[in-house]
Amino acid sequence: MQTTAQQQALSLQNPCVAFMFSYQQKDLSKMLELCDSSGTVEFVPLGEAGKGKIGELGKTIWGLLIDCFPDIDNTLDAAVAEDSNTVRCQVVIRGTQEKDFADIPNQGKHFDSDHIFIFHLNQNHKIDHIRVWWNHDDFKRQLGA
């Protein structure tokens, strides 16, 4: 039998797990539906250029990843409720490049990269902030850049 705290933690994880599943399905619309329309995103390795609105910068980057890496996939290794509104997901993302991506010319190479997504949910259980970390130098190295 689950405790109330365990049930709350599972409930909190659901939008975040659903977001990662939607990403795995390449369903950008569903990913964005799980987010607050005024939510923010930080792709930490990109510095200031990696900060913006989920529905603008997030939509653009995830859309480009799905387009340039059509076999993109992810494995959710862990989802941990850090507090009542925050979930940390440990994810492995992989894919084979088929188009130029940002400053990385297409060489048809494959990447396999550990990522950390930290999701914050608002009172309406919508994702209102996402912070994403990965080793960008290793990502570029795997793609031959």
Predicted regions and their residues:
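Exposed beta-sheet edge and beta->alpha loop/turn motif
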Residues: 92-123
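Short solvent-exposed loop/turn micro-motifs enriched in small/polar/acidic residues
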Residues: 14, 71-73, 111-113
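A solvent-exposed, acidic/Ser-Thr-rich amphipathic alpha-helical stretch
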Residues: 9-10, 30-87
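Short beta-strand segments enriched in hydrophobic/aromatic residues
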Residues: 35, 93-95, 133-134
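Hydrophobic/aromatic beta-strand elements that line small-molecule binding cavities or substrate pockets
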Residues: 75-80, 114-120, 131
